[in-house]
Structure formats: C-alpha cells, structure tokens
C-alpha cells in the first residue's frame, strides 16, 4: 500500500496502550513514505498550516486547540491524501473536538495490543539473531523480569548486552546479563 502510494482509505487511526508499538509503526511508515512528503511528528510538534500530502501524527490526543481546528479544516479542504494517527484511546473516546474525532473515525481503526511475554521473548530472539548472536530462553526470561518491560527498553538492553558481550569476549548468558545490568545501573 505505502510503497505504491495508493491508500484504500484516507485515514488510518491506530490506538492502544503505551508500549504497544504505535510510535514504531508510525515512524516506519513515515520513513517508507518519506519520498512522497511524509514525516513523523507528534501532535505537540504539529504546525498549523504546514501541509503535507501524507500526515503522520503520533499522540493525537495531545493536539492543541489551534491544531485541532487546522486539522479539521485540512480534512474539509482535502489538504492531504492520507492521514495516519495514533492515540491511546479509540476515536470515540479521544479528548478532541467532536467534529475532528468524528472525521478521524471515518477511516480504518486498528487497536494494537502490547505483546505477551512469549511474543516479547520471540521478538528479542529475532533481534538477537539479526545482531549475530543467539538468545536462549533463560536469558530472555531474565531480561523480561529484571529490565523495563516496554519493547524499546528491552531492545536497548539487548543491544547493550550485545556490546558488553563483545567488549568482554564472553557469550551471552544469564550471568553476563546480570553483570551488564549491574554495570548499567552503577
């Protein structure tokens, strides 16, 4: 869809709890569509009258009143060909002007759920493989119980573990992970 520049809907609204991956998806989409004028931004960074053919707005519930009015007018003026937004609540519950919330609800709406521990473990193992090392279940389980649990923090911890493993010349094990976490907290 994005690679061809054709969108079946004018609006896609993604919502879910913090850490579910909304920002990751929006940034990846904006990067994929950058040649067509897309750029990632948060609602706090939204500049009224700054028109782009593809708008990608994160944390839409933080859009100021002036931005809400401008985005509503952009809808009516067909000032963009595609709008991708993310929020922590569904369109009917988002704290925005009712007319804007109604417009946002006219397209596709997807709810993202946070990954389960098993899915996080699988994602960490896949990330480790890409980085060139294996991650056994014991290491993944320890990481899930002793580090911040959002995927961004877990990936950062895994990357730090990889660097620590290379610096010390040791393979990735639970004792190495403990040492790496202790060092990062010191």
Identify the function of each model-found stretch.
Residues 8-25:
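Walker A/P-loop nucleotide-binding motif
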Residues 107-119:
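Conserved AAA+ ATPase "SRH/arginine-finger" region at the nucleotide-binding site
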Residues 31-42, 51-52:
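Post-Walker A helix-loop "phosphate-sensing" segment adjacent to the P-loop in P-loop NTPases
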């Amino acid at each position: 869809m994005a690679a061809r520049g054709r969108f079946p809907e004018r609006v896609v609204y993604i919502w879910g709890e913090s850490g579910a991956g909304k920002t990751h998806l929006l940034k990846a989409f904006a990067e994929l569509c950058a040649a067509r004028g897309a750029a990632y931004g948060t609602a706090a960074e939204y500049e009224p009258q700054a028109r782009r053919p593809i708008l990608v707005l994160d944390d839409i519930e933080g859009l100021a009143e002036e931005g809400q009015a401008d985005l509503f007018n952009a809808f009516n003026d067909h000032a963009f060909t595609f709008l991708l937004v993310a929020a922590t609540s569904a369109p009917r519950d988002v704290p925005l002007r009712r007319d804007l919330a109604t417009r946002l609800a006219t397209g596709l709406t997807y709810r993202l759920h946070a990954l389960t521990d098993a899915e996080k473990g699988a994602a960490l193992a896949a990330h480790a493989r890409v980085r060139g090392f294996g991650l056994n279940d014991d290491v993944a389980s320890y990481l899930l119980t002793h580090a911040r649990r959002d995927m961004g923090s877990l990936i950062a911890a895994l990357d730090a573990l990889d660097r620590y493993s290379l610096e010390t010349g040791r393979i990735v094990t639970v004792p190495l992970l403990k040492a790496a976490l202790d060092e990062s907290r010191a």
